[in-house]
């Protein structure tokens, strides 16, 4: 019996709708933050934000189409 587990990659998102920043964080900060939400790994991407791999679908990630960062929400 096999199971299909849906996973996604993406930028971690702060409650204010912005990407989770990592410019001044320690080297493993993003990997640790990604593992907290059950992702397999992560790193500080060129946009200076945490990018995670293989997170569960319930994790909210930043999306350009639904971006609310800086809009007071």
UniProtKB/Swiss-Prot annotation:
Arginine amide occurs at 71
Q: Which InterPro entries match?
A: LCN-type_CS_alpha_beta_dom, Scorpion_toxin-like, Scorpion_toxin-like_sf, Scorpion_toxinL, Scorpion_toxinL/defensin
Q: Which GO terms describe its cellular component?
A: extracellular region
Name of the featured protein: Toxin Td12
Q: What biological-process terms (Gene Ontology) are attached?
A: defense response
| Principal cellular location given in the protein's record | secreted
PROSITE patterns of this UniProt entry?
A: LCN_CSAB (PS51863)
């Amino acid at each position: 019996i096999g199971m299909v587990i849906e996973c996604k990659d993406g930028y971690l998102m702060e409650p204010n709708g912005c990407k989770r920043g990592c410019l001044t964080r320690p080297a493993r900060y993003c990997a640790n933050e990604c593992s907290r939400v059950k992702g397999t790994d992560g790193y500080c991407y060129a946009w200076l934000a945490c990018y995670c791999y293989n997170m569960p679908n319930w994790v909210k990630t930043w999306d350009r189409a639904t971006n609310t960062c800086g809009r007071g929400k």
